[in-house]
Swiss-Prot record:
Protein name: Oligoribonuclease
SUPFAM superfamilies assigned: Ribonuclease H-like
Gene responsible for this protein: orn
Assigned EC number: 3.1.15.-
Source species taxonomy: Bacteria, Bacillati, Actinomycetota, Actinomycetes, Mycobacteriales
Compartments, as annotated in UniProt: Cytoplasm
Amino acid sequence: MSESENNTTPAVAARDDRLVWVDLEMTGLDLKRHVIVEVAALVTDANLNVLGEGVDLVVHATEEELAQMDDFVTNMHESSGLTEQIRESAVTLKEAEDAVLALIEKHCDPAHPAPLAGNSIATDRAFIREHMPRLDEALHYRMVDVSSVKELARRWYPRVYYKQPEKGLAHRALADIVESIRELDYYRRSFFVAEPGPTSEQCADDAQAAVDRFAPYFD
């Protein structure tokens, strides 16, 4: 995927405001028993422009590791073609981790670690922490979870929620990332305050209103 440069794309934002989008496919959800079998990553700037080429790697797993998949995961990975690619792959998890770290080094400021971004990323972060600790250390402890925005849209602006772009449900890592970036772009257009945003005075008024509303809980 090449860097987006057209008249409809916001200017590329500062290097210290990058987001690292990672999606994993695993053999299951048990950190100790299951393994990572696909790693995809893209870096965007603050305006959600995709920067350069990303990472999209299938990681080899042994037959014993594949046997740990339950029926649901087995069917999902077989239907997507991932299982066959896992068996054919010679890529190790360390090599996949190295590739993501190289992507981060190329596009992000090491003095300002970028947050991990994605959809429902708590499980991905847990597997990163357990199985790719160097990558975990390279990321900011904060995360940008698009599913949090989705849940707020459902409660505050149901029309926004129900009109979100449809997902392909490919259950492949790179496709999932692109869909997550696209979804956040949609929410930014439909849900958030349009640029240039509120004035400083409006922000101050809103902050005071929030303080006043919840002041009784601090008495």
